[in-house]
């Protein structure tokens, strides 16, 4: 009897163990959603549908006669925009495979926007054109990899052709023309950007903010702007605007924290003896030292202010060196054996005026040697070229901008929040396009640079017929920007494309705003080479990947499980 009972217990343990394993496996499977797999023509066809629907929404914004797109937002009023990348980002499809296609086009638009800052609509319609032709060719039995090689060869040839025809720009008028085109023909925006670049230089910082009036305004901050304000409000000298204003001040630049009274006594004596205001820039000013500065300001009448040095680590130290060069002073650092108690007048910097608010400090007209400042700028430019980190490059460019040109603020005005938002989108595009044009030069606008580059592809030799078809795919795609701009202006796009290809003037194009054929360069209708080049390269790259796709894996939609009724009844039972 005892043996029988122990056998039952053993079986029960095995049963429980088996049940636990089954439960474990079933819970593991519940953690992973079921997948749906699409193959071949069906997969590419569904992807293409997503690409086409997104491209149709984006392409209506292209050109001077392009239309607005209204986007519903999860909060606030709907957004009205003519910015291609904004439209693309807002689109999401319920169908998972369609969404894969749309997401890849968004990737193209974002990549183009990140590199060139404009050209997202052009990149989107090029992607659609290349992928559409690629799908047809693969369905007809072409080798997808040979098509891709042909597409790559054609793109390389077009980029070389565009670079050979690019013209560098330098005058304010040319800069204004680029800005005007990218702002959908609004001349005022183009001129505003040209004025800003004239004021702060091509490497200067230009920022965009909301204006407080109906009109667009340009505010220029000459000199260096530090993102740190006064440590204590006791340093304020102008109660009306709550700022500390120092004229012809001495500037102490120190790498470490200042904590003892003795550390600030010597520099205060120098300021008092010279009857000049004093600014202290350091990692921090603590307790006793801070109290000493405030007491001297309140009782002895010395105009003094202290701010924390902006940045962290090596970036902070480098920024302080820049400030020392700009103001003609020295960075007081323990590494060189310097001591605050032995500071003399030659170690202090100077400038014409400093304005310090609770948030920032603006140093105007530093007393540094112009040659030393230029040498420091060259060092930073060299460091930018050698740097491989995007973060480091960004910080170096900020330092260069502060040293070389100052800061311009474009204040965008309008009658409503929606109008200001729409104008800011266009100003951002125009500013990015202008910077790209200054960097790599310009080509005739309105899509004609790509259109005429398609002629050169007739001479391109390929290894086989399928590669030749790849070249023809790019040839046909290069016609779509002109076709789309003309169509949005209410003209038959194919007629405009045909007429332009019949003649030999590489600068002749269709001015959609006026409805006539003009010399695009003379008319000021120009595109930055960097924008056109980036749009084509990114579009061809992603389109080629989609064309060579043979399977797509997506999640199946989850089944909605019936929720049991509350109270006495059971879910799903009728009485």
Swiss-Prot record:
In alphabetical order, the GO MF annotations are: ATP binding; ATP-dependent protein folding chaperone
Query: What keywords does the record list, in alphabetical order?
Result: ATP-binding, Chaperone, Mitochondrion, Nucleotide-binding, Stress response, Transit peptide
Cystine residue pairs: none
The answer to whether keyword ATP-binding applies is yes
Its function, per the record, reads:
Implicated in mitochondrial protein import and macromolecular assembly. May facilitate the correct folding of imported proteins. May also prevent misfolding and promote the refolding and proper assembly of unfolded polypeptides generated under stress conditions in the mitochondrial matrix.
Q: Which family does it belong to?
A: Belongs to the chaperonin (HSP60) family.
Q: What is this protein called?
A: Chaperonin CPN60-2, mitochondrial
């Amino acid at each position: 009897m005892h043996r029988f009972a122990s056998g039952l217990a053993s079986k029960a343990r095995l049963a429980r163990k088996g049940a636990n394993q089954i439960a474990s496996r079933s819970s593991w499977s519940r953690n992973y959603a079921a997948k749906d797999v699409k193959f071949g023509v069906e997969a590419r066809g569904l992807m293409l549908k997503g690409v086409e629907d997104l491209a149709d929404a984006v392409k209506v914004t292209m050109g001077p006669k392009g239309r607005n797109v209204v986007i519903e937002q999860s909060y606030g009023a709907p957004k009205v925009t003519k910015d291609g990348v904004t439209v693309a980002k807002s689109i999401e499809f319920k169908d998972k495979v369609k969404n894969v296609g749309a997401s890849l086009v968004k990737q193209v638009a974002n990549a183009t926007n990140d590199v060139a800052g404009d050209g997202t609509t052009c990149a989107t319609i090029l992607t659609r054109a290349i992928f559409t032709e690629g799908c047809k060719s693969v369905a007809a039995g072409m080798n997808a990899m040979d098509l891709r090689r042909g597409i790559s060869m054609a793109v390389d040839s077009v980029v070389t052709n565009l670079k050979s025809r690019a013209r560098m720009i330098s005058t304010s008028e040319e800069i204004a023309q680029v800005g005007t085109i990218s702002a959908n023909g609004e001349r005022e925006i183009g001129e505003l950007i040209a004025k800003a670049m004239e004021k702060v230089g091509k490497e200067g910082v230009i920022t965009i903010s909301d204006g407080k009036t109906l009109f667009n305004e340009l505010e220029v901050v000459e000199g260096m702007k530090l993102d740190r304000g006064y440590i204590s409000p006791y340093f304020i000298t102008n109660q009306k605007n709550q700022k500390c204003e120092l004229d012809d001040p001495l500037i102490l630049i120190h790498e470490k924290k200042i904590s003892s009274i003795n550390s600030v006594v010597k520099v205060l004596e120098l300021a008092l003896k010279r009857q000049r205001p004093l600014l202290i820039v350091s990692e921090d000013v603590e307790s006793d030292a801070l109290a000493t500065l405030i007491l001297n300001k309140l009782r002895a009448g010395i105009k003094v202010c202290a701010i924390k040095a902006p940045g962290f680590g090596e970036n902070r130290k480098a920024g302080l060196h820049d400030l020392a060069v700009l103001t003609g002073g020295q960075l007081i650092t323990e590494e060189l054996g310097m001591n605050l108690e032995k500071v003399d007048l030659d170690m202090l910097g100077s400038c014409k005026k400093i304005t310090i608010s609770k948030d920032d400090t603006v140093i105007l007209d530093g007393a540094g040697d112009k040659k030393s400042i230029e040498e420091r700028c060259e060092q930073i430019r060299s460091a930018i070229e050698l740097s491989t980190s995007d973060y480091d490059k960004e910080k170096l460019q900020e330092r260069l901008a502060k040293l070389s040109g100052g800061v311009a603020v474009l204040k965008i005005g309008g009658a409503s929040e929606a109008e200001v938002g729409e104008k800011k989108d266009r100003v951002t595009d125009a500013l990015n396009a202008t910077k790209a044009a200054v960097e790599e030069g310009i080509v005739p606008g309105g899509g004609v640079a790509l259109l005429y580059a398609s002629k050169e592809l007739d001479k391109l030799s390929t290894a086989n017929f399928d590669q030749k078809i790849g070249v023809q795919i790019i040839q046909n795609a290069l016609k779509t920007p002109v076709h789309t701009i003309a169509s949005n202006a209410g003209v038959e796009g194919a007629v405009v494309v045909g007429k332009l290809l019949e003649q030999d003037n590489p600068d002749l194009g269709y001015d959609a705003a006026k409805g006539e054929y003009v010399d695009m360069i003379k008319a000021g209708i120009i595109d930055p080479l960097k924008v056109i080049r980036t749009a084509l390269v990114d579009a061809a790259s992603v389109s080629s990947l989609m064309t060579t796709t043979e399977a797509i894996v997506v999640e199946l939609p989850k089944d909605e499980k019936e929720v049991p009724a509350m109270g006495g009844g059971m879910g799903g039972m009728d009485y």
